[in-house]
Amino acid sequence: MITHEVERTLAELSSTGSSAKRICLVSWNGNPAKLDLRVWRTVDGETKPGKGVTLTDEEAETLLAALTDYFG
């Protein structure tokens, strides 16, 4: 069984109905938290992770550099 703990929500990018796309710091299976971009769904009052991507610090820094270059 995969476990998760959202340690901090950095931003909510969008939401529709019972789902929201968020950037969070998430610990998976008791490991150190990593940056996580994912859709979170609320089902029967419980928030569950949907499809997404987890990034190491190095990957997040590379993404930040690429976005900064793209947006100027």
Residue ranges and their predicted role:
Residues 1-72:
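Positively charged, low-complexity terminal tracts
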